[in-house]
Amino acid sequence: MKKKLFIFSNESISIEDNKYYCDNLDLKSTPEGLNKKFEVNLLGRKSLKKRSHEIKLKRIKVFNNIFSYLSEVKNASKNLDSKFLIISISPYTFLISIFLKTLGRKPIVYLRSDGYGEYKAILGKIGPLFYHFMFSITGAISNLISCRDYILRGKKGKIIGPSQLDSVWLRQPKNLDIKNFKLLYVGRIRVEKGIFSLAELIKNKRDISLTIIGAEKGRSSGINQSNIKILPRIINKTKF
């Protein structure tokens, strides 16, 4: 019998025809992959906006506010033989980690990116201070894992190597004589993702072009460069 694994996320999840959808591909692939070894229960924030990727799990719950979310965290903590995984540090997941600690449970926190840089991009100078406060406390009461050593900032933790590149991406390799560099970015167009910095770096570079896949319907990207092509989200990866 599989052990239960509760995954807590700050990501928004929409519901349509009893199916659950998210924008962040990691929130789809990580729980689905772990579900092969655990009985995964995914918890997240409810979104009224339709999201892109269907999460193929049987046990998903979404919440309108932090109070109902924490109430379910309390219920989950009663499963004594279960594991608890928190994806990324945000105000929501920060409170969840503290709440689990008060309930006598020690979660695993998975850090996928540098929160210091992301919060600086979002909040300015105060951003790194705000993230440092959450990171310091969370790191002291949790077991950390990350995809990069520098993200841990010297704290003890495990390093893993996740990748979305599977056999579909690698099925037809070619040897090319590269004269012009063609870059591909697949993801959300957000300042904290660094995409605007990349656009500025290649501005006026005639030998470099960038294709961005991830534009949201009805929302301006704010990027207008001749060497950048912006396309809407593509669900089927074989179409890339």
Task: Give the positions of each predicted feature.
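An aromatic- and histidine-rich active-site surface loop
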Residues: 84-104, 109-116, 151-154
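Glycosyltransferase donor-sugar binding loop
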Residues: 186, 209-222, 229-235
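N-terminal subdomain of nucleotide-sugar transferases
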Residues: 1-50, 200-204
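A structural motif in glycosyltransferase catalytic domains
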Residues: 34, 183, 198-201, 210
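A conserved mid-protein helix/loop that constitutes part of the nucleotide-sugar donor-binding site
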Residues: 25, 181, 188-204, 220
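Membrane-proximal helix-turn-helix segments that form the acceptor-binding/catalytic region
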Residues: 29-32, 102, 125-144
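A short, active-site helix/loop in glycosyltransferases that binds the activated sugar's phosphate group
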Residues: 46, 131-173
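Active-site proximal beta-strand in glycosyltransferases
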Residues: 2-9, 100-117, 145, 158-161
